[in-house]
From Swiss-Prot:
GO MF annotation, one: metal ion binding
Protein name: Fluoride-specific ion channel FluC
Binding residue positions for Na(+): 74, 77
BP term (GO), one: cellular detoxification of fluoride
GO CC terms in record: plasma membrane
Entries under Pfam families matching the protein: CRCB (PF02537)
Membrane topology, record value: Multi-pass membrane protein
Swiss-Prot/TrEMBL keywords: Cell inner membrane, Cell membrane, Ion channel, Ion transport, Membrane, Metal-binding, Sodium, Transmembrane, Transmembrane helix, Transport
Function: Fluoride-specific ion channel. Important for reducing fluoride concentration in the cell, thus reducing its toxicity.
Cross-referenced HAMAP family: FluC
Amino acid sequence: MFNLLLVVVGGGIGAGIRHLTNMGALRLVGPNYPWGTMAINIVGSFAMGLFIAILARRGGSNEVRLFVATGIFGGFTTFSAFSLDFATLWERGATLPAFGYALASVIGAIIALFLGLWLARSLP
C-alpha cells in the first residue's frame, strides 16, 4: 500500500508540473502547435534516462524508483515510460521488437484515440 501511495503522490506532482509546462508554452508560443506536449515528451524522456542511469550506477531503493520514475515522470509524461521500454528492448539486443513496439504503440494509440472519438460522437 505504501508503494501505491508513493506512485500516487509522485504522479500528482508530475501532472502538476506537466500542467504548468503546458500553460507556460501556451503563453510563450500560442496554441497553434503542441509545443508544450512535445517539450514535455522530450524533457521527460531525457530526465527518465538520466534518472535511471544514475539509479543504476549509484544504487537506489525501489521506493525512490517508484516515486520518481513511475510517479513523477509517469505523471509528467507516459512517453518517458514508453521511451524507457524501447531503450530496454534495444539495449537487450532486441532491435526488431523495439521498433515493433514503437510502431505498434504510436499507431495503436492514434487509432485508439480516433476510435474513442468516433464512439463518443456516435452515442446519442
